Amino acid sequence: MKRLLIFFFLSILIKAEIFDISIPENDTASYTYADFRIWINDSTDTLRGIYWFMHPNNGDSRDIVTDTAYQNLAQEQNFAVLGAHIFNMHMDTGIGDAVITAMDSFAILSEHQELSFIPFFINGYSWGGQFAYHFTKWKPERIVGFITQKGGYHDTTNAELAIQVPALMIVGENDLDYRIENLTNIFLNHRPEGAKWILAKEPGAGHSLVTDFSFLNSFFNTVVNLRIPHNTNLFEPIILNSLSDSIGWLGNQDTYTLSLIHI
């Protein structure tokens, strides 16, 4: 049985709760460390999902939960905000199980039992985007959508059921070739299979965090509104809506604009 290192903070000013949990390795795991922090708006009776920002290599995104921009974005959809400090992005190390264990523990600590069932939306930068993709391949039924920004070592094997999870894959026009090619080839190899994915190129940008938040947030809100069923029971496993092949995002490569369309 895994041990839990638990810390609790109550933020009175913003009427929210912040919880910290670390999940040490057990005898079968090899992910090194897995630390999590979650923010929950005190006025939210029932959460609908978890917005998770994942850090780049050797990073730590736990402080993201105190960012008011992410808090406001999340609370509009009745989402929690999650940050993490994770070393390994390969699910066979047990890191995926550690994430699920952390959510089950947060469910008990916060008295939000729905945390054991509600879906994640993951926005990952660089290494964090690779983690988002790998976690989605491992547990597609728990992912409402994800963003992967400019990683270069995404798993290139078949994505299987993850092709049904809406994704925004972003490369930088001036980033290193191997990063552009890794993500572009994954996209091109899976679109013929019906992958519900977008490939976007940030003009004039290298390996930097995307700061066009209106664009990123629009994708998040659109996907959440389409995928989470209305009047669903959030206290049991949730069957997310599948996106119809008759809708999609059409990009204009000359103007760098993107629009949701119905065919």
Question: For each of these PLM feature ranges, what is it?
Answer:
Residues 44-91, 177-179:
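Short substrate-entry loop that stabilizes the transition state in hydrolases
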Residues 54-58, 125, 132, 136, ...:
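Cell-envelope and extracellular/periplasmic
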Residues 16-50, 120-143, 153:
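A domain-start/cap signature at the N-terminus of enzymes
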Residues 46-50, 77-82, 117-119, 140-145, ...:
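Loop/turn elements at helix/coil->beta-strand transitions in domains of secreted/extracellular proteins
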Residues 144-218:
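The feature captures the conserved acid-bearing segment of alpha/beta-hydrolase catalytic domains
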Residues 261-263:
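Conserved small/polar residues in nucleotide/adenosyl-binding loops
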Residues 3-13:
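Sec-dependent N-terminal signal peptides
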Residues 45-46, 93-127, 137-140:
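Gly/Ser-rich "nucleophile elbow"/oxyanion-hole loop immediately N-terminal to the catalytic nucleophile
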